[in-house]
Amino acid sequence: MMNKLYIGNLSPAVTVDDLRQLFGDRKLPLAGQVLLKSGYAFVDYPDQNWAIRAIETLSGKVELHGKIMEVDYSVSKKLRSRKIQIRNIPPHLQWEVLDGLLAQYGTVENVEQVNTDTETAVVNVTYATREEAKIAVEKLSGHQFENYSFKISYIPDEEVSSPSPPQRAQRGDHSSREQGHAPGGTSQARQIDFPLRILVPTQFVGAIIGKEGLTIKNITKQTQSRVDIHRKENSGAAEKPVTIHATPEGTSEACRMILEIMQKEADETKLAEEIPLKILAHNGLVGRLIGKEGRNLKKIEHETGTKITISSLQDLSIYNPERTITVKGTVEACASAEIEIMKKLREAFENDMLAVNTHSGYFSSLYPHHQFGPFPHHHSYPEQEIVNLFIPTQAVGAIIGKKGAHIKQLARFAGASIKIAPAEGPDVSERMVIITGPPEAQFKAQGRIFGKLKEENFFNPKEEVKLEAHIRVPSSTAGRVIGKGGKTVNELQNLTSAEVIVPRDQTPDENEEVIVRIIGHFFASQTAQRKIREIVQQVKQQEQKYPQGVASQCSK
């Protein structure tokens, strides 16, 4: 798709040659036609990265024939819909903070990071409605954040101009900036940006950032990457997660530079051992990294001269819902191993993303939102789910917050309805939180609640936060969830590490539904919820294909 730019506030004396020369002098050559009108002009750039560079370089900064020109995307009023672009985002702004800011103005359907060569970040944001996007433009234009002033533009929403059916394909999840268009790419040829997640010892974080942020700025500049150090996650932990967004080559180079900094710091502080590389990877990808009988890992170890181990499933938690791949060896060896490991993980992830197009959309709730890019919705309005989550009674105040501030903020962030049911008695030990929303909203809301309970010390620091969740399923599908001789539910428990209880003698409610109880830590509970929903969906599809009698036989 061409990126048409509007050039405004031009003097009547300006010619096409003037514009071509001005753009050329600033290394922004115009290859296509320049459409010059009285006082304004239009130019096209096939590459969004070049378009952004032109806006940032020229708009409000360059004088031509005595007038300061304005440059922005050319979007007619009828195309000013749900899509906006935010530029000049601070390079070290945590994505979680940006998520919360964007969610204040409406439901965010998709956030894509645009790969640019600017020091600051650029994202394209799609709101659920035109009105929400309009409010966001008004409120965020010029918004000051860490001495950076946001710059906002409308960008064309292809769905407004194309007579497509109501079903919206390729609509991503909130906070999904990691899967932006590659420079020069189109929406059909989208490059999936698969970020590298690593754990670094907390004592090295200062060295990686450097004085006044100079070291990390140097890393991002040299490697054309974005490096997020999640300093606030899991306060007091010995290690902090670091997320690197870039091309595969840029990611690997940034990783190598971080390894070198840590090793240098370790040498100077006389730490005897080599600092291992710890890569975080989603559990669903790890099996394919290991390979049959461990062949893939053994091959990487042999070729790079490293020793590689992978954490057990039992280590999964809300703060680290990924497996930890520990690579031991020299800096050079670890860097070489990272290239090969990420190659395998990236390949597996891309295959999964292709699979999403033909399967139910539960992937989006299994892959953590801070790690990967947008996951397609398969309907304009994703199916609403209701989950009842039980929390300690003494934690209710922390979840609600002062005058309800925290629960309102949480609901906005997640895009869910969150209500706390009245206590069933004066001395109950648990209260029920009713969460209503699509899968992505469930993931975010439940994740934040688990995290809040951990942060506020309602559980022992060494104790895993385990909560009970109730979901309702049609009574006709309960047998399928249990499986013959309990086989399915046993496999489900082994896969997810959650306890799943489907009472056989439960009386269905007025909607012919029964309650499935799920007990476990956040990641275990989420995986179990998604797998159970998938089973229910499969039964529904069977019932649509076959007469009722046949379908009911199939479900038993």
Curated annotation (Swiss-Prot):
The family this protein is said to belong to: Belongs to the RRM IMP/VICKZ family.
Protein encoded by which gene: IGF2BP2
Keyword check for Transport: yes
Phosphothreonine modifications at: T507
GO term, biological process aspect, one: regulation of translation
Domain notes per entry: Domain KH3 and KH4 are the major RNA-binding modules, although KH1 and KH2 may also contribute. The contribution to RNA-binding of individual KH domains may be target-specific. KH1 and KH2, and possibly KH3 and KH4, promote the formation of higher ordered protein-RNA complexes, which may be essential for IGF2BP1 cytoplasmic retention. KH domains are required for RNA-dependent homo- and heterooligomerization and for localization to stress granules.
Residue span, KH domain: 193-258, 274-341, 384-449, 466-532
Record field: compositional bias (Basic and acidic residues): 170-180
Sites of Phosphoserine modification: S11, S162, S164
Subcellular location: Nucleus; Cytoplasm; Cytoplasm, P-body; Cytoplasm, Stress granule
Top-level taxon in the UniProt lineage: Eukaryota
An example Gene Ontology CC term for this record: cytoskeleton
Keyword list, A-Z: Cytoplasm, mRNA transport, Nucleus, Phosphoprotein, Repeat, RNA-binding, Translation regulation, Transport
Main location: nucleus
The protein, known as: Insulin-like growth factor 2 mRNA-binding protein 2
CDD domains: KH-I_IGF2BP2_rpt1 (cd22491), KH-I_IGF2BP2_rpt3 (cd22497), KH-I_IGF2BP2_rpt4 (cd22500), RRM1_IGF2BP2 (cd12626), RRM2_IGF2BP2 (cd12629)
InterPro entries xref list: IGF2BP2_RRM1, KH_dom, KH_dom_type_1, KH_dom_type_1_sf, Nucleotide-bd_a/b_plait_sf, RBD_domain_sf, RRM_dom
Region feature (Disordered): 156-188
Oligomeric form and interacting partners: Can form homooligomers and heterooligomers with IGF2BP1 and IGF2BP3 in an RNA-dependent manner. Interacts with HNRPD. Interacts with IGF2BP1. Interacts with ELAVL1, DHX9, HNRNPU, MATR3 and PABPC1.
GO-annotated molecular function: mRNA 3'-UTR binding; mRNA 5'-UTR binding; N6-methyladenosine-containing RNA reader activity
Gene3D superfamilies listed in its UniProt record: 3.30.310.210, 3.30.70.330, K Homology domain, type 1
Chain ranges of the RRM domain: 3-76, 82-157
